[in-house]
Amino acid sequence: MIIPWQKSTLYKHKTSIECLLNYSFMPGTPETALDNLALVHTYAALTSTSTCKICQTLYSLISKNTPAVSFYEDYSLLCLTCLYAPITWTSTLMTAADFIEIIKTHFPTSDTSNFYAPQSLLAIDIQLHFYIHRCFKVLSSNDILSTSSLQFLKTTFLQGKLTGSIPGQFCFKTAWIKNDTCCNNTSHDLPSNLSSVFCKADLQLKPNLLPIILDIWSASDLFKNNVSNSEQPFFTYPEDIDICQGPCLLSPSLGLTQKNNTTSICPLCECIASHPNAIDTLQTLKYTIINCIENNVKLLDRISFILSNDELDFIQDPILKTVIQNCSIQEIHKHFFCDPQCALNIKKTSTNILFKIPDPNLLKVLCARLATGEHLSKNYYLDCEYLETLALIFKCSQTCKVGKTTFLEIIRELDLLSKKHNIPTVKAFQTSQIYA
């Protein structure tokens, strides 16, 4: 049984992960972008007529080799983990490590020497399959066309993010599908079949991944105030790349942009994906920010007071505490109160599923059910494809050129659905004007 999200898996496939990271940088000079193999691969993957390379890889392998039932169990467990993981750079990295572990385990004769390389698989393929389109989700035949329309919107805006603009003839009002019953979540708790496996208080936690993430990003502008203590760096940056943006193509932002002391890759969301105590710690911090003063003091000032007075003694892990302390007040404000993608990550993530090590016998029984598609149709905390699509294209439209009418229509629909799903953020227009 392959348990996802483990540091040991990352080190086991270090050579393959290094190849993936090498092809996840922006080129050092803009004039070389057109010939950059990683960018060409990424652009092609985002065209509306392209196929999913992960789906094609799996189909090819299964057609040539009949895998054991354990393959479907391991793959479905990874899919469940991705369903409850935040959409972040760290999630893409860990999923890439887990995916190649599954392939090498169940298809040992397949050639994986260039598994992560241009014209094979790169970060965008992991993102599209496991996080953006979620090809593994069980889908009703009645929803196929509407889902395809949402996929078109996502890839159009992601491609625009990569190139800098959306095609001039694009009309959001025509492409958008209004749906009064966007999702059918009546309960926001995990069903007993999942909670009995992952939510027991006495379960051991997997090692936290935050030190590795800090190490990989140490030379870039992300986490720039944090010092990596690694004596043996996990990864060394190649030459002729944009060091400041780091290996940013592993992130759905497809770049590292900066605005008003914030970045398009949220450091606190990366903490959620890499540290088992991050969500509880950040919830405590948010509560402290909201309740520390009774007067009408701005949120930014409240955050400033808490950071300056060193009121973070409740954080036990020194590395996590340092990362939070080194965040700007704007980054904390953006994460808790402004950014719709951050809000979705907070609401949809299950620390228990990501970081707890279940009882093997109980997990084996669960995986047999997962392999049939059970529990893979939705995230029980929140599962709204329309809201997730709007959040994604909103983030893309912050940095790529779109028409004014299109931008305002996206904001309007995003605000309406955020309110419907009780996503507590400021108006999207405000966020778009002040933060990355």
Curated annotation (Swiss-Prot):
Region (Zinc finger 1): 52-135
Transmembrane segments: none
Residues that, per the record, bind Zn(2+) 1: C52, C55, H129, C135
Gene Ontology MF annotations: zinc ion binding
Keyword field: Host cytoplasm, Host nucleus, Metal-binding, Zinc, Zinc-finger
UniProt region (Zinc finger 3), positions on chain: 182-421
Annotated S-S bridges: none
Binding site for Zn(2+) 3: C182, C183, C384, H421
Localization: Host cytoplasm; Host nucleus
Region named Zinc finger 2: 266-342
Family matches, as PROSITE patterns: HERPESVIRUS_UL32 (PS51988)
A single GO cellular-component term on record: host cell nucleus
Broad class of where this protein is predominantly found: host cell
InterPro entries assigned to the protein according to its UniProt record, in alphabetical order: Herpes_env
Residue positions binding Zn(2+) 2: C266, C269, H335, C342
Protein's job: Plays a role in efficient localization of neo-synthesized capsids to nuclear replication compartments, thereby controlling cleavage and packaging of virus genomic DNA.
Protein family membership: Belongs to the herpesviridae UL32 protein family.
Name the record gives this protein: Packaging protein UL32
